[in-house]
């Protein structure tokens, strides 16, 4: 119950400070994109978007595997709102204004920039949590929270395995609960409504 109260506090929080608000919005976008990490969002290309979906490869963390995992997330109002709010300049290949238009994929400098962006987001999130009196979180927590919410709201273990991109379902079993089946896209859209994105 306390965790749910803390989540509501965080989702309803807004700040006049653009840097802090951006960090919180990117945390929400990470949740909405099935737990995409900051690196994924930095490198999201305009060519990854269709009218209805976001299609991209998610690079898993070094702790698990370096294999690329294909993601296919249905676009909804929450996702599109943040894509517009933080849109990269017209000439940029990127969706979001996180990287410079001239930053090249696959270079060490771009990799370092993404890590720096993630660090800054985490610092801002820590300050937000401190100001509203809840335990500290990081960008990574969006993925774990999305997974838990997905299972608690009727998503099956197999569906969660699919959207998380786990190679082995054993990795996903940490979220295992006996719940009825639902369509992934419908469930994800309902969960995203709770992000309070405005």
Which residues does each predicted region cover?
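Long, amphipathic, Lys/Arg-enriched alpha-helical "connector/arm" segment
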Residues: 1-22
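Short, basic, alpha-helical segments at the C-terminal edge of helix-turn-helix-like DNA-binding modules
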Residues: 189-195
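Short, basic (Lys/Arg/His-rich) helix/loop patches that form interaction surfaces
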Residues: 12-18, 89, 122-162
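Active-site/catalytic core of tyrosine-dependent DNA strand-transfer enzymes
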Residues: 4-8, 75-134
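Catalytic-site neighborhood detector that most strongly recognizes the C-terminal catalytic loop/helix
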Residues: 1, 58-63, 102, 164-189
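Conserved tyrosine-mediated DNA breakage-rejoining catalytic core shared by Y-recombinases
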Residues: 43-85
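Short, polar N-cap/turn motifs at the start of nucleic acid-interacting alpha helices
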Residues: 47-55, 135-136, 155-174, 198
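Short pre-functional
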Residues: 24-39, 149
């Amino acid at each position: 119950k306390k965790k749910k109260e803390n989540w509501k506090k965080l989702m309803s929080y807004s700040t006049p400070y653009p840097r802090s608000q951006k960090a919180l919005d990117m945390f929400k976008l990470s949740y909405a994109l099935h737990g995409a990490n900051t690196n994924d969002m930095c490198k999201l290309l305009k060519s990854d978007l269709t009218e209805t979906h976001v299609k991209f490869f998610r690079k898993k963390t070094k702790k698990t595997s370096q294999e690329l995992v294909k993601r296919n997330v249905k676009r909804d109002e929450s996702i599109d709102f943040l894509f517009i709010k933080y849109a990269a300049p017209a000439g940029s290949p990127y969706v979001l204004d996180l990287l410079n238009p001239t930053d090249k994929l696959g270079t060490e400098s771009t990799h370092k920039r993404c890590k720096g962006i993630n660090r800054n987001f985490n610092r801002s999130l820590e300050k937000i949590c401190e100001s509203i009196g809840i335990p500290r979180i990081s960008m990574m927590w969006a993925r774990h929270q999305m997974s838990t919410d997905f299972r608690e709201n009727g998503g099956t273990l197999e569906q969660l395995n699919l959207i998380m991109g786990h190679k082995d379902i054993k990795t996903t079993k940490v979220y295992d609960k006996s719940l009825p089946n639902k369509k992934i896209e419908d469930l994800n859209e309902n969960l995203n409504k709770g992000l309070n994105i405005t």
